[in-house]
């Protein structure tokens, strides 16, 4: 069924395929255009550099008049990210406008890596370390970057394991 939200999401997907902003990628699930997987690569010259951070975007039929629900699936240590992965970002709440699309949502989240807002913390510990103990903050962030790589390797191992299982079945 084609609805305004679904048509808009297909346009957003086309834009992401043809002209994705640097360091971000996203696509809908194969069987549900209303749910997207996304990834943000940590920007250069930040403690998040080269991290691979996975996100989930869930849209409803009111999109683009209402923002999607967005959360990190990857572990994240950031002043504006709650422990459950939800993001404290004004455009995902009271400053949302229908002109935002998937690309602009992801680039706005990516900009938080460059410019955290410790004045409006979702993670008080991260905000305090960011303001008062920058070296400890950077150390914690780098640990999450390394964890993001391990998670990616685990995902690849899981894929390999699936292939191995198929080979085992054929050998029997």
UniProtKB/Swiss-Prot annotation:
Organism expressing this protein natively: Saccharomyces cerevisiae (strain ATCC 204508 / S288c) (Baker's yeast)
BP-aspect Gene Ontology terms: cellular response to unfolded protein; cytoplasm protein quality control by the ubiquitin-proteasome system; DNA repair; DNA-templated transcription termination; double-strand break repair via homologous recombination; ERAD pathway; error-free postreplication DNA repair; error-free translesion synthesis
Catalytic residues (positions): 88 (glycyl thioester intermediate)
Record function comment: E2 ubiquitin-conjugating enzyme that accepts ubiquitin from the ubiquitin-activating enzyme E1 and transfers it to a E3 ubiquitin-protein ligase. In association with the E3 enzyme BRE1 and LGE1, it plays a role in transcription regulation by catalyzing the monoubiquitination of histone H2B to form H2BK123ub1. H2BK123ub1 gives a specific tag for epigenetic transcriptional activation, elongation by RNA polymerase II, telomeric silencing, and is also a prerequisite for H3K4me and H3K79me formation.
Protein family (similarity comment): Belongs to the ubiquitin-conjugating enzyme family.
One Pfam family in the UniProt entry: UQ_con
GO terms for cellular component: chromatin; chromosome, telomeric region; cytoplasm; HULC complex; MUB1-RAD6-UBR2 ubiquitin ligase complex; nucleus; Rad6-Rad18 complex; RAD6-UBR2 ubiquitin ligase complex
UniProt keyword list: ATP-binding, Chromatin regulator, Cytoplasm, DNA damage, DNA repair, Nucleotide-binding, Nucleus, Phosphoprotein, Sporulation, Transcription, Transcription regulation, Transferase, Ubl conjugation pathway
Modifications made to the protein after synthesis: The N-terminus is blocked.
An annotated Gene Ontology molecular function: ubiquitin-protein transferase activity
Upregulating conditions: Up-regulated by UV radiations and during meiosis.
EC number(s) on file: 2.3.2.23
Quaternary structure annotation from Swiss-Prot or TrEMBL: Forms a heterodimer complexes with the E3 enzymes BRE1, RAD18 and UBR1. Also interacts with UBR2, RTF1, PAF1 and the RNA polymerase II hyperphosphorylated form. The interaction with RNA polymerase II is BRE1- and PAF1-dependent.
Location in the cell: Cytoplasm; Nucleus
Superkingdom as given in the UniProt entry: Eukaryota
Annotated metabolic or biological route of this protein: Protein modification; protein ubiquitination
SMART domains reported in the protein's UniProt record: UBCc
CDD domains linked to this entry: UBCc_UBE2A_2B
Residue span of region Disordered: 145-172
Reactions this protein catalyses: S-ubiquitinyl-[E1 ubiquitin-activating enzyme]-L-cysteine + [E2 ubiquitin-conjugating enzyme]-L-cysteine = [E1 ubiquitin-activating enzyme]-L-cysteine + S-ubiquitinyl-[E2 ubiquitin-conjugating enzyme]-L-cysteine
Additional free-text comment from the UniProt record: Present with 2770 molecules/cell in log phase SD medium.
Acidic residues bias locations: 151-172
Gene3D superfamilies per UniProt: Ubiquitin Conjugating Enzyme
Keyword rRNA-binding part of the UniProt annotation: no
Modified residues (Phosphoserine): 120
Name of the protein: Ubiquitin-conjugating enzyme E2 2
């Amino acid at each position: 069924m084609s609805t305004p939200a679904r048509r808009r999401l297909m346009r957003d997907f086309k834009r992401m395929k043809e002209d994705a902003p640097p360091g971000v990628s996203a696509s809908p699930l194969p069987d549900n255009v209303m749910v997207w997987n996304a990834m943000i690569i940590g920007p250069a010259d930040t403690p998040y550099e080269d991290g691979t951070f996975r996100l989930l975007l869930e849209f409803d039929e009111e999109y683009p008049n209402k923002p999607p629900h967005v959360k990190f699936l990857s572990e994240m240590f950031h002043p504006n990210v709650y422990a459950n992965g939800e993001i404290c970002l004004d455009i995902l709440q009271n400053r949302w406008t229908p002109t935002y699309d998937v690309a602009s949502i992801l680039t706005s989240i990516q900009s938080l890596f460059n410019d955290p807002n410790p004045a409006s913390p979702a993670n008080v510990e991260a905000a305090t370390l960011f303001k008062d103990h920058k070296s400890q903050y950077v150390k914690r962030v780098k640990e999450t970057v390394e964890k993001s790589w391990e998670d990616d390797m685990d995902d690849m191992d899981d894929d390999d394991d699936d292939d191995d299982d198929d080979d085992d079945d054929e050998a029997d």
